[in-house]
Amino acid sequence: MERTYQYAWIIPFVPLLVTMLIGLELLLNPTATKNIRRIWAFPAVLLLSIVMVFSTKLAIQQINGSSIYEYLWSWSITSDFSLEFGYLIDPLTSIMSILITTVGIMVLIYSDNYMSHDRGYLRFFAYMSFFNTAMLGLVTSPNLIQIHIFWELVGMCSYLLIGFWFTRPIAANACQKAFVTNRVGDFGLLLGILGFYLITGSFEFQDLFEIFNDSIINNNEINSSFATLCAFLLFLGAVAKSAQFPLHVWLPDAMEGPTPISALIHAATMVAAGIFLVARLLPLFIAIPYIMNIISLIGVITVLLGATLALAQRDIKRSLAYSTMSQLGYMMLALGIGSYRAALFHLITHAYSKALLFLGSGSIIHSMEPIVGYSPAKSQNMVLMGGLTKYMPITKTTFFLGTLSLCGIPPLACFWSKDEILNDSWLYSPIFAIIAFYTAGLTAFYMFRMYLLTFEGHLRSHFQNYSGHTNSSFYSISIWGQEGSKPVSSNLLLTTRNNNDKSSFSNCSFSNTYKIAGYVRTMRSSFSTHFLNKDSHTLLYPHESDNTMLFPLLILAIFTLFVGCIGIHFGHEVMEVDILSKWLTPSMKLFHQNSTDEDWYKFLTNAFYSVSIAYFGIFLASVLYGSVYSDRQNLYLINSFAKIDSKMRIRLEQIINVIYNWSYNRGYIDVYYEKVFIKGVRELAQLAHSFDRRVIDGVTNGIGVASFFLGEGIKYIGGGRISSYLFLYLACVSIVLLIYYYYNFLN
């Protein structure tokens, strides 16, 4: 065991070899390297697999022995101060290492085919391997200084990967937005690190916890307000990195990068870094009740905000991004209420489910691009999808499993972890628990909305010219966006409404009917889009992805089905498969000290309510979006709403519009930041520029000009005649004497 731990330092550096070798080969022999570029996927996967096997061995030893191993070596700067570097192997490190490597391997295999035609293939794999190195270095860090170093490397890699297609202005702006937003959190993190060093005199976790808890808190040796401020600054770094309110605005824009990047960022790397940091520092935070309250409050706000912002999104990746934001809020809420085990459990289950969903969305986008075009506004638009079950059955099945898992449907992975958080939240605050339960229903609604719009009904790619640029309401805004498409004349009656040219949130439009050419059911023969080229008339339609893209989906689907088993707790008298509790053995177990059958009974009771809420959300999504273009019964359902009392109907429409506008416009938070912060900073910069140009430069330039004219004047006065000099001298002396005598006369 000791020998295994001694070689644990290689964990972060093994994937770095790929980045270094690719760079070296491109430098020495660029042409040959580019010609055989796809061969580099093999060493990238192989080296990360070695790290995965090594991490698994360490994890097994952690389960059996529950030991912590730390190795440090010092870099002395002065006799009074030295920096220590090394690695820390404990249950949290082993969990994160396995998570990063397993998801990373699946993403690398998937990317080989997904990025095969991209000119930046080699650059992509170099960035990805370096990203894995940075994240593995972060989770093995034994102190705050080393964490900060790798924390910044993670941020740099995310900047490079989000802006991978940097020639697209929208991608370039997105990576800058992510970078600047995270600067706010990183600045807070650095100040917090320095503040706690000032308090404790150490950067090491173990020393930090012991000194802070024993010597400082108990003896009141420092100002508690200062300690709270430093802890809040540390937490601010996690808020930015894990896209918590109010620093969440970068996350949906990060979808401008390639889809495999989105899967890695949202599942196991960047956004997980913030959760990891709070989990690592939880013994510190738990000694400051105010900080725990702030963490739980930020978490519950993010849970609800992320879910509401996902309701009306049309971009499939942005919908998943807001879903990630909401689920990260659940994890932060769990950490804030002290439920360490539940937070890490949900981090594990969510990582595999969300990686499955993102890679599934990449498969969908990959299939839609030849049909609707390569612009993300079309290929990622759920408006133009639908009916993909027929063409992509494997992708559909895996995506469906991921959707059910995220909805919290048993026995899939996220059910066990989410319900544990819901169960623990009741013990902390009933208000937080009610919000968390309500959000579980919203999660089921928007996830099934996404699934139904993508896979059910019929293919809608032929409506790509009606994607929301006109005023009338053909389809509901929940599908088409803020403005519907033009009504087309003829046979079919679809109900629409005219309310200042704004559409409703659901399929339930009420007044004014328009006839549309042909019943949509007759469009079955038009599933494909026809394109003309020089030689032939080619029929294009969606198709299933290649095996190298399907293989990771199937593996992640297996994880989604069974990874929840590691944390199921049945009680000792029934059955015990709770590997996670044996693995973690955390120092704080506020809710899992003595688990009994009564606890299991409470869990089942809460699970019944949460699953019922989830099924209600699924039912509501099915009513509003299920087979919307192929089932005639849906028309009767829509028209039945017209029988509602007019006042109630108007009130309902107003409520629906408010919800839609809030969701579609991202809660107006981006608009607020744009007007208050961005424009404010720009105006301040312009004011500073104007002051510098007119005042600072004016004074210096004025002195120079005055000196010039003074010199010119003196030059013309001096003509070389001694008599003129004597006259000037006597005149000056006379003036001085007159002033002197006049001053004495007055006194």
Curated annotation (Swiss-Prot):
Pfam families: Proton_antipo_C, Proton_antipo_M, Proton_antipo_N. It is a multi-pass membrane protein. Its EC number is 7.1.1.-. The keyword Ribosomal protein does not apply. GO terms for cellular component: chloroplast thylakoid membrane. The chain crosses the membrane at residues 8-28, 39-59, 89-109, 125-145, 147-167, 185-205, 231-251, 259-279, 281-301, 328-348, 355-375, 397-417, 426-446, 550-570, 608-628, 726-746. One of its GO terms (molecular function) is quinone binding. Its main location: plastid. It is found in: Plastid, Chloroplast thylakoid membrane. It comes from the Eukaryota. One of its GO terms (biological process) is electron transport coupled proton transport. NDH is composed of at least 16 different subunits, 5 of which are encoded in the nucleus. NDH shuttles electrons from NAD(P)H:plastoquinone, via FMN and iron-sulfur (Fe-S) centers, to quinones in the photosynthetic chain and possibly in a chloroplast respiratory chain. The immediate electron acceptor for the enzyme in this species is believed to be plastoquinone. Couples the redox reaction to proton translocation, and thus conserves the redox energy in a proton gradient. Belongs to the complex I subunit 5 family. This is NAD(P)H-quinone oxidoreductase subunit 5, chloroplastic.
